[in-house]
Amino acid sequence: MNDGPLSNLVKHSTLFCLTVMLAGCFSDGPGDLFYDYQTKIARVQDADEIKEELEFESLPRKRELLLDVPSLSIGLIDSYQLRQCGLFNLIAERNSVLGKVADEFRNYDYQVALLAGVGRCLSGSELDPEVVELLREIEQQKLAQFPRHQWNLIYASDAMQSQMRGSQWLHADIGDQVRQTSDALEHINRALNVPLVSGKTTEVQEVLEKSSTLGDLYYSLTRASAELDTITKQLTTFDDNIICGKQRDTTKFRYINNVFEQQYIGKVQPYMAQLDGYYQQLAPQLGMFDAQPDLHSYYFPIKDAHHAFRSSTRRHVDYWQQLFKRCGRKVGR
């Protein structure tokens, strides 16, 4: 049997506090796809629409995610020796008024530059022993603190908070936006994994701050899963209303088959495939959001949302396959 679009589709805690009626009204196109789909199914079933509530938990605010990093007092010791290896000006800039109010992106770039500078100084042979000892101590302390600076860059920076705090459906015409976000996240990943040879994180800060691609994708995946689960429940709850078989009135089956073709195959499935495509494009960069329980209990659960999205799709497709088998329709016919 040729499973056609059904098999092809299968092959292929949330960002803001809000309670929505899953079968209710929506403010934009993608949400209407699911609403229309369920409405037409319920009409054919001659049944009430099942309504489910879904509560989205907000992305924690910056103050809830910011990890404290004890400051190290680095005095301008032996300024001549530090100048020789390029560390003096860096420390002086950090100790300035502007340096003390740097955001998480600039702070991360400073921490990377400081470690690189300390390494250069230690590789020289003209430092006094007491300076070498102090720099080695600073290096050890900074390396121990580095994971906390990385965490703060990902979760407590204004740019990444903006990027992850989504509240609307993604549309199917934002390919350029997704590519820009993917490129920016790739840059951040390099800065996290090979910081001493990567470019500054501030190079992509504006791109990340001016969109909420990740947040809106997370919202869309989560919302689509919930909508589809509600529609699957609608179908299974009133499955007995769809009569088929020899010498039976199969009018409702013909009608619901039309709903499947026109609404699901024609509209919902293409949108779901687009969401999945956006996720796959960003997926190589999402490792930075894996859980880090040693640092914090929170993690950005976009991978979980995509797993639930795939599972919801599989359950929905399973229902239609079972219905078509019961009623003798060959998929793709």
What are these regions (language model features)?
Residues N2-T14:
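Bacterial N-terminal signal peptides that target proteins for export
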Residues M21-G24:
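C-terminal motif of bacterial Sec signal peptides marking the signal peptidase cleavage site
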Residues F26, Q84-G86, L122, I243-G245, ...:
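Sequence contexts marking disulfide-bonded cysteines in secreted/extracellular proteins
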Residues F26-P30, E55-L66, E206-T213, Y264, ...:
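Eukaryotic low-complexity, intrinsically disordered regulatory segments enriched in serine, proline
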Residues D28-H171:
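N-terminal Sec/ER secretory leader and immediately downstream segment
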Residues E139-Q285:
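Extended amphipathic alpha-helical interaction segments
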Residues A273-R333:
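Hydrophilic extracytoplasmic domains
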